[in-house]
Amino acid sequence: MKKCSYDYKLNNVNDPNFYKDIFPYEEVPKIVFNNIQLPMDLPDNIYITDTTFRDGQQSMPPYTSREIVRIFDYLHELDNNSGIIKQTEFFLYTKKDRKAAEVCMERGYEFPEVTSWIRADKEDLKLVKDMGIKETGMLMSCSDYHIFKKLKMTRKETMDMYLDLAREALNNGIRPRCHLEDITRADFYGFVVPFVNELMKMSKEANIPIKIRACDTLGLGVPYNGVEIPRSVQGIIHGLRNICEVPSESIEWHGHNDFYGVVTNSSTAWLYGASSINTSFLGIGERTGNCPLEAMIFEYAQIKGNTKNMKLHVITELAQYFEKEIKYSVPVRTPFVGTDFNVTRAGIHADGILKDEEIYNIFDTDKILGRPVVVAVSQYSGRAGIAAWVNTYYRLKDEDKVNKNDSRIDQIKMWVDEQYRAGRTSVIGNNELELLVSKVMPEVIEKTEERAS
């Protein structure tokens, strides 16, 4: 990382820098190491922001206004005035989106705050002003791929256009949130640093904070120590903090999951000085998706040791809303929200669950998420697996639990074994097992009306 005292000037190159040594298009991208070790700089306060209604919505059939408002309500219930889910963002281009944003603003919630997203266009800024929204994201692509290939402009022309838009926002009392798209392919020292330095000067003069959202548009960021810019998440955040002197409160990371690194990259951004991580519920977003909001809640819990007064069971309720009302199919093995995320199938694991569910469950998923541990029965379950299914499905406790050596478990196992001898390939359904239990151990059903699912 270069020294902070250096005066970085815009490098208005004639020929774009596409970093072809790192990004040869016909090959897999490369990681270049410089072995520079940067210090961690976890902010005192870290937050989650949401793009479910923006990046999330643009990657699937549009939500209805009713769905947008209901999801917004769920996010508020989940946050529970903890302030962890700090903001969400809306498109303003259609009447439907503007109406939904208006209804959400009328709710009067402190968290999440309603913000917007616009292109680098003053006409778009008028929409923000007319809506009375206090902060807006602004698309400010910063790599030469975008500047030269998409915008067909020079770096100076691009920078001047962006600064003019930010200035216009400040003049209207609107907080700019500058979305530095494709920062993991950008010339950090030749464009990003001089541009952000100018933004910070404007911020001080106006006495209005300007936020910097570092956007890993193609998921090319890597979290490792000693990686060279532009792919280094550590280097980007450290540079914004220490070279550009952007306050942690004004740095946000927005990632994509193209290389499976979106959660780790996001946590790394927190650890090295970004206060906020931009997410979408279930990770729904362009191509491989954004960082899942629910994932960062559990990252927050592990890093900070608590989630304040958040209502984490609302994560389950919101996932069920997406499946039942929006008809979005959540992959069954998705952590924390998939139907099978805490389902055990292996017989040897089921035996452990039978002894103590702590052995094979990540935490008390029933208490925290309203999702009790579940054992699925298959040809590999054995007596332990079947007994564990009975105990977990019917939520039996202490002396009410059924032992794997119970003769009635043998009766169920005989039926299960016969199913697979006959060529069955699917797991045994809960409804099938319920029928068997009602026949061989009806008193179990009488003990409780609760069922795991």
UniProtKB/Swiss-Prot annotation:
Cofactor binding: number and manner: Can also use magnesium with lower efficiency.
Protein name: Citrate (Re)-synthase
This enzyme's EC code(s): 2.3.3.3
Catalytic activity: oxaloacetate + acetyl-CoA + H2O = citrate + CoA + H(+)
SUPFAM superfamilies the record matches: Aldolase
InterPro entries (alphabetical): Aldolase_TIM (IPR013785), PYR_CT (IPR000891)
Gene Ontology molecular function, alphabetical: citrate (Re)-synthase activity
Co-factor(s): Mn(2+); Co(2+); Mg(2+)
Keyword terms, alphabetized: Cobalt, Magnesium, Manganese, Transferase
Pfam family, one: HMGL-like
Function: Catalyzes the condensation of the acetyl group of acetyl-CoA with oxaloacetate to form citrate.
Residues of the Pyruvate carboxyltransferase domain: 46-316
Disulfide bonds: none
Regulation: Inhibited by p-chloromercuribenzoate (pCMB), EDTA, Zn(2+) ions, and under aerobic conditions.
Family (UniProt): Belongs to the alpha-IPM synthase/homocitrate synthase family.
UniProt source species: Clostridium kluyveri (strain ATCC 8527 / DSM 555 / NBRC 12016 / NCIMB 10680 / K1)
